[in-house]
Design a protein with these regions (language model features):
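Rossmann-fold NAD(P)-binding glycine/threonine-rich loop
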Residues: 1-11
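C-terminal helix-rich "cap/oligomerization" subdomain common to oxidoreductases
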Residues: 7, 116, 191-240
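Hydrophobic residues in well-ordered beta-strands that form the structural core
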Residues: 12-14, 146
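Predominantly a Rossmann-like dinucleotide-binding segment in NAD(P)-dependent oxidoreductases
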Residues: 18-93
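A general structural signal for well-ordered alpha-helical segments in protein cores
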Residues: 24, 79-80, 154-155, 186-193, ...
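Short aromatic-enriched loop/helix-cap "lid" or pocket-rim segments at secondary-structure transitions
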Residues: 24-26, 50-55, 106-107, 135, ...
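Contiguous beta-strand/loop segments that form the cofactor/metal-binding neighborhood of enzyme cores
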Residues: 80-154, 190-199, 234-240
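Active-site loop of classical SDR/Rossmann-like NAD(P)-dependent oxidoreductases
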Residues: 176-190, 206
Length: 240
């Protein structure tokens, strides 16, 4: 698709709502306040309304591996794409997950290591269980807390209390964003329209490089978990 977009000089952008969200952009602008970043943690676990049918033996589209829409592809990407957008490609990946009876990946937990950044990352995703955990970016000087990584209605900065002042001072949570007054998809569509009107092929936010690197990460997760789709044109054998 990227080759064809270049050939025909058309605009191509991944439809990722998370990173064009104004609150996520605000988070990115304030990352420096965290000091040395030590960990990225993101969770998106949502019990699918179609899972009950699956347990009854009825395979609907949301749990059909023929459609290449397993848990990591469907909702796990919302935890991984922002990580790659902020920190780039990890140096190592260790994935664990649950495969359902038809080979469909129901959920996963993945640990990442960034050697040059001296930080780690962990993501959780599921279509077969709920979680209500917020997501965080943890630094030596403070923590960013994101209520929902995929739509980021609220982003808070919580500074670290200096050593020795824990009894006399309390950390004051600062809201960096505000509840969205428009659908999260509005900002995705606006970014795409702006690119077309400005004659640009590639978004600086949802860039081609970020999309490719995210797919490389997901391919490695799939390789480790043994997730294969009929649409795969080659076996997933490469490692990072």
């Amino acid at each position: 698709m990227m080759e064809r977009a270049m050939e025909y000089r058309v605009t191509l952008m991944e439809a990722m709502i998370s990173t064009v969200n104004p609150n996520f952009i605000k988070l990115k602008e304030n990352l420096g306040r965290l000091g040395k970043i030590r960990r990225y943690f993101a969770s998106y676990c949502q019990y699918s309304s179609r899972y009950d049918k699956f347990k009854e033996g009825v395979i609907l589209n949301a749990f059909n591996p023929k459609l290449s829409n397993g848990s990591v592809m469907d909702i796990g990407i919302y935890t991984i794409y922002p990580m790659v957008a902020l920190f780039g490609m990890p140096d190592s990946i260790q994935a664990e997950g649950v495969l359902l009876s038809n080979g469909f990946d129901g959920q996963g937990a993945v640990n990442f290591k960034y050697d040059q950044l001296d930080m780690t990352a962990t993501v959780l995703y599921s279509k077969i269980a709920n979680s209500f955990l917020p997501s965080e970016i943890e630094g030596e000087d403070g923590t960013m807390m994101i209520d929902q990584i995929h739509i980021a209605q609220n982003v808070d900065f919580i500074p670290r209390i200096p050593t020795g002042q824990g009894q006399s001072q309390k950390a004051v949570r600062e809201s960096l964003g505000s509840p969205l007054d428009k659908s999260p998809y509005y900002y995705e569509i606006k970014e795409f329209i702006d690119l077309i009107q400005e004659g640009k092929q590639i978004s600086s936010i949802n860039s081609w490089d970020t999309s490719l690197d995210t797919l490389r990460v997901i391919d490695e997760i799939r390789r480790q978990l043994g997730i294969a789709y009929e649409a795969d044109v080659c076996e997933l054998t490469s490692k990072l």
